[in-house]
Amino acid sequence: MRRILAAIVGFILYLPAFPQQRIQPKNIEIVRDSFGVPHIFADTDAEVAYGLAWAQAEDDFASMQEPMLPVKNLMGRVQGKKGAAGDYAFALFRCREITEEKWNTLSPGFIKLAEGYVQGINAYARKHPEEVLHEKLFPISVKEYISSAVFALTIFNGADQALIRIFNNSEWEVPELNNKGSNAAAVNAGQTSSGETFLFINAHQPNTGSQAFYEAHLCSKEGLNITGGLLAGGPCILHGVNENLGWAHTVNYCDRVDEYQLEMNPANSLQYKFDGQWYNLEEKTVRLRVKGIPIAVKRKVYWSRYGATMKNKQGFFAIRLGANMKIGVLDQWYQMDKARNFSEFYAAIDKQELSMFNIMYADRYDTIFYISNALMPVRDASPVYN
């Protein structure tokens, strides 16, 4: 089915360093094939991102909204006690503050893309208020949107499990390996009977919800021409192929998270030792709103030089991981989308914003490549450290 988006008045969002350009929906074309996959065409990458947001929202707006709820402290209001844990974790891991602190590390081109995507989300929410999960969720700003991505990657990297262990006063246990998992392979042309280079992808994702792949084709006059999969709320392809190259992600199991028990000052219960000196824990009270409970529930969140810090019966524990230190993972995927050869692709992944995942790569020039990618610390190998 072929149609052109009707003109819709978008929200103009304020962004200090980079003034936004208002997207004109009439310049965007969404063509759905016989499978319902959207093929989105426009002059600029930002316009394509607007169209992608609109197409995703048409298909599953609820899943798109879910990762954004903690940004507005609304997950508890929508999902009850379980959701309130997400609101607490968002505050605990300081996703909003980290986004603000690292904002200038994002490329201007990506910021324009994100602006277009957010304008598309806000426009759809305004046009379809009956589909909005909570009346206070929209409009959402670009910085709020990026902070939601930081939170999602922080949780996906295992911070949620560390949080649960500390909350339950339980020790870390070696997990049993699951024999089921995603698969990917790249085969050089010299090893195939047809003389062609092959890239195989068999990603194991659920069929529904925010972790399900959403397939799309994005095409602009600024060099974006890629098809593949993304997760709910993604502004670009996270796993796919363009005219010149392709890549696959599978989950790897690198040790990306450290948990520290802090040595507290006997003379001051909110001071901890770091490099031989005592430092004050940063303390903040968050007000959690829970569906069905008329009053706010107050909880303390702490921050140390190690990172997000919690208190349990055994003392204070901090959670430290690379995913909670950077904000440019979507920017990196955007640069991967636009890469024309291995040199450009490697330059994109060399930014080291992606905190996990295997990367399997192949291109039309018969280059194949694999890396088990992660943001991991250089740890002290002595038993005392562990």
Where do the protein language model's features map onto the residues?
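Bacterial Sec-dependent N-terminal signal peptides
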Residues: M1-Q21
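Mature extracytoplasmic enzyme cores
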Residues: Q21-N386
